[in-house]
Amino acid sequence: MINEIRKDAETRMDKCVESFKGNISKIRTGRAHPNLLDGIQVEYYGTATPLRQLANIVAEDSRTLALTVFDRSMSGAIEKAILTSDLGLNPASAGTVIRVPLPPLTEERRKDLIKLVRSEAESGRVSVRNVRRDANDKVKALLKDKEISEDEDRKSQEEIQKITDLMIKKIDAALADKEKELMDF
């Protein structure tokens, strides 16, 4: 029973870490990367459709993304969706190809992005701690029902804490990498 609780907690904490990494991967660093446009939805025949389903996205060079639109009539809607996104990008259309140059990041914008990344990291840590609290509550319930001894309770809480510490270290490492990436480029 305790092993199940521990494994469940570890799985849920791992999902929190992966969610955090996914969130910060969408934050632009000044380097062109196709994943940068992942969050953009385009109005396609009355339905919000992910941009990836309407165009092939490639990094043309370190500062430019090129989108090859599958349906030429959608070029205008795709441009509008990129313009209205909060990424601060200005696309230029040339037939079926839309080029999206990435402006260099200003020092002020870098600092804002670092604040955003740190905020995401704190949210990730809080999520991990919430999972820890849930797991510890389940273990305490077992102790209260006299299904486990106090020694087993203490031991399992220590194991859950070790897992929590490991997951928070993963979040901190990803945070440090992203901060370095933002400041170096």
From Swiss-Prot:
One of its GO terms (biological process) is cytoplasmic translational termination. Belongs to the RRF family. InterPro entries: Ribosome_recyc_fac, Ribosome_recyc_fac_dom, RRF_sf. It is found in: Cytoplasm. Pfam families: RRF (PF01765). This is Ribosome-recycling factor. One of its GO terms (cellular component) is cytosol. Gene3D superfamilies: 3.30.1360.40, Ribosome-recycling factor. It comes from Edwardsiella ictaluri (strain 93-146). The keyword Acyltransferase does not apply.
